[in-house]
Amino acid sequence: MNEDALIGLFSTPLYKSRVDVDPSINEEYLKSLPYFNFPDGTGACSRDQKILLNPKFESLKKEIDKHVNIYLYGALKIAQGKPKHIQSWITLHKENQASPKHLHSNSFISGGVYFECPPDCG
């Protein structure tokens, strides 16, 4: 007997929430950081590739870590191990720029915080 089934074996779960951002991390501050332009012209990236380890971002990192733990230990029911911060950066897109489709293949968890964006995007 042939029983067809669809199994979400390699699905990508998505966790969505809101995080509080320190008011000092404002547009003026974000624009003052050093960036390099992407070669394809789609935007720019902070030179600091571990931006969440910057003391200015300490409270944001704590917020993100809280949600990572909710996801890992609450939603996925991970029983052992501890996540390790590998990279964090800021991507800057100006009008008519967007991030092309891409993967973060070196990560078990990958996420984004949107500091400013139009309604119904991201």
Model feature map: region roles:
Residues 84:
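Active-site cores enriched in adjacent His and Asp/Glu residues with nearby glycine-rich loops
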Residues 1-81, 98:
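Non-heme Fe(II)/2-oxoglutarate
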Residues 87-122:
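Catalytic core of non-heme Fe(II) oxygenases with the double-stranded beta-helix
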